[in-house]
Amino acid sequence: MVNKMSVIGLQQIKKSYADGNQMRDVICDLNLTVEPQEFVAILGPSGSGKSTLLSIAGLLLSADSGEIIIGGQNLTNVKQSEWTKKRLELLGFIFQDHQLLPYMKIGDQLEMVAKLKGEKDASKRKEEVKGLLAELGIENCYGQYPNQMSGGQKQRAAIARAFIGNPQLILADEPTASLDPERGKEIAQLIQREVKSKHKSAIMVTHDRSVLEYVDTVYEMKKGKLVRL
């Protein structure tokens, strides 16, 4: 049940794709509510609809039907330009691949994101970025290019990018998949700390059951719906 305090509410979401001459239901009448300071994990085999669900929650993909409510705002039928604005304002994304630009230093990349999110003051952008990198233990990477960093450092930089602008909701798609188990746990713990200390929420799609100790609620995608475990 979505209430005024819920960070995100998905109600009766449906999504189908063409599969040859037929339509295949990927998401069927799915409901999900995430509250402030709640860290949710979604499990399920490849092709079960987990990433599709995350794309709908992240305003990257339209559902065929149903309602999307984020931050108390019904965003189901708004224009794409408004979706872009709300993504920048309300959401932070972490991907399996860090997707850092190889030709820009980390500090410059993150400050560019801060500018896109509305911070006009260059000194404040630099202060925010340096603060986030310090919180994540990679302050020495500020002036480095991605090819000078380890895999774990690059994923931490990607997490810093997601945290810029203080978004209400963090969406993470297999953020630990390319890391060894210990580094994967560190990444999940960093997301958990951000959620709890800064009154945010997070949804993480994962195959990695070793990180579930850091989440509050676990669901599994089954036949297009979420089953709570």
Task: Go through each PLM region and give its residues.
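A short, proline-enriched helix->beta-strand linker immediately N-terminal to the Walker B motif
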Residues: 164-168
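Short coil-to-helix segment of the ABC ATPase nucleotide-binding domain corresponding to the Q-loop/switch region
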Residues: 104-113
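Helix-to-loop junction immediately C-terminal to a conserved catalytic motif
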Residues: 58
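Catalytic Walker B motif of ABC-type/P-loop ATPase nucleotide-binding domains
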Residues: 170-173
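ABC ATPase NBD coupling module
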Residues: 75-92
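Conserved ABC transporter NBD signature motif
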Residues: 66-74
